[in-house]
Amino acid sequence: MNFAPTEEQKMVREMVRKFSETQIKPIAAELDRTHRHPEEICRQLGEMGLMGVAVPTEYDGAGMDNVTYVMALIEISKACASCGVIASVNNSLYGYPVKAFGTEEQKKKFLAPVAGGKVEGCYALTESSAGSDAAALKCRAELKGDRYIVNGVKTFITSGNVARYCVLAATTDTARGYKAIINLIVDLKNTPGFRVGKVEEKMGLLASGTAELIFEDAEVPAENLLGKPGQGFKQMLSGLDAGRIGIGAQACGIGRAALEDAVEYSRERIQFGKPIATFQAIQFKLADMATELDAAELMLLRAAWLEDNDLDFEKEAAMAKYYASDVAMKAAIEGVQIFGGNGYMKEYPAERHMRDAKICQIYEGTNEIQRVVVARKLIGLR
């Protein structure tokens, strides 16, 4: 067993760390305060190959592995969680299904521009009545001639207000449940009958837009179908597995930011005539944060390695996602505690980490659903 990263992985991680420290971190607070979409950062990430880390080079990706992707996403998210989730969605939720199930023509047309950072992608699954029960979709796609006519509303779609392309999950027949689910690639800027609805006001990830997508007799070419009819639910689950690795990496980055900020602050904050870092109560908090975050990163790297080697990674991705997000939330809370009253103030980054961390326990499947996934794999239930 070799825990050492390759020279390429070390080089990429260091490159992303330097870029994130110098270009992203200095504007993270401003992005959070103004809710501004970091378009310039997204373009730069694309130019560096970080919007399609594991996408082959022939589709304008970096052609690297998923282990490298995890390392890169941790560093981006450590600097700015909003930038992290934007990169995660482009790489995983949007990029994975198009890469895995798209035709050659679809990959050239719809994957390459996103992987290269020219435009952004999103994945539209969630509906008001279809959250954890992902098979309960009501968004309807009816085939008429050479087009699908789509009607329905998608909610809480990350980057939905800025994305050019979207992988849309819809049903062709609500009575047939998961068997009727399909995935369509939609050009959101060139689809009659589509419009962006409400852009949500959120607790955290304030520089990442979360929007409602409304389809009213929207026309989508039938050639934009991913795979074949009846394969959509399986594609969806496979894409969510990949997405969970990305969200786990995002969580790990947030947790590491909380830890590093807490370490620095505890060295500088003087109480009772000495730095609070010398107090055992603070030391124990820092030690627990570091230990749990290290364990989470190792779990994520294992899941990514399994994916790279075409092995089943469903259980490991679920484990890594829920553990990483739980310990990130704990680290963020402890970070605020170590900062004391200052941690509650927007002048310091601790409160932002806590707001950003919470969603990682919820999206890409709640952590309760992750435990169901793990338990079913252990027991042998489908």
Which ranges hold each PLM region?
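Short Ser/Thr-interspersed hydrophobic loop/turn segments at strand-loop and sheet-helix junctions
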Residues: G49, L73-S77, A170, V186-T191, ...
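Flexible, small-/acidic-enriched active-site or ligand-binding loops
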Residues: A136, N190-E219
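Alpha-helical interface subdomain recognition
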Residues: M1-V89, F101-Q106, P113-K118, L143-Y148, ...
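Short Gly/Pro-enriched turn/cap motifs at secondary-structure boundaries
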Residues: V114, S129-S132, F156-S159, T172-A175, ...
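Short glycine/proline-enriched turns and hinge-like loops at secondary-structure junctions
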Residues: M64-D65, D133-A135, S159-A163, G177-A180, ...
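Long, acidic (Asp/Glu-rich), low-complexity accessory segments flanking structured domains
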Residues: E216-K234
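A short core secondary-structure module
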Residues: D146-R147, N151-V196
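A short, Trp-centered hydrophobic/proline-enriched beta-strand micro-motif
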Residues: G117-L125, A169
